[in-house]
Curated annotation (Swiss-Prot):
InterPro entries, sorted: UPF0145_dom_sf, UPF0145_YbjQ-like
Pfam families assigned to the protein according to its UniProt record, in alphabetical order: YbjQ_1
SUPFAM superfamilies xrefs: YbjQ-like
Stated name of the protein: UPF0145 protein RB3016
Domain of life: Bacteria
Protein family: Belongs to the UPF0145 family.
Length: 112
């Protein structure tokens, strides 16, 4: 399913708006990953394990949002936004939102 953070598709015409859609995921962090991240913060560099959790969570939120868009009869989602927050001391919540739409490919102008 085509998805974009913009409010339009350059290559598609939006025929109908089906409504807002959301995807939510919550991931727990483990102690070893926390210790590794603290060490990375002190030494410098990237916390690869946390980045993997963020990517997995973001992809899961997008997949959930895509399924909800399909349930509304949509074939695309526009205006996607993400929100990240912590729940308690060891949980990460990732929420995505967007607008489900029916979008059809633009037909190229034959005169050009």
């Amino acid at each position: 399913m085509p998805m974009t953070t913009t409010s339009t598709f350059e290559t598609h015409i939006i025929e109908a708006y089906r409504g807002p859609v959301f995807g939510e995921t919550i991931y727990g962090a483990n102690v070893l990953r926390d210790i590794s991240a603290v060490f990375t913060d002190v030494v410098g560099g990237r916390a690869g394990d946390y980045e993997k959790v963020l990517i997995r969570g973001r992809n899961a939120a997008l997949a959930e949002m895509s399924e909800r868009a399909k349930q509304l009869g949509a074939n695309a989602v526009i205006g996607i936004r993400f929100d990240y927050s912590t729940v308690g001391r060891s949980m990460l919540m990732i929420c995505s939102s967007g607008t489900a739409v029916i979008a059809n490919p633009r037909i190229p102008d034959a005169s050009h």
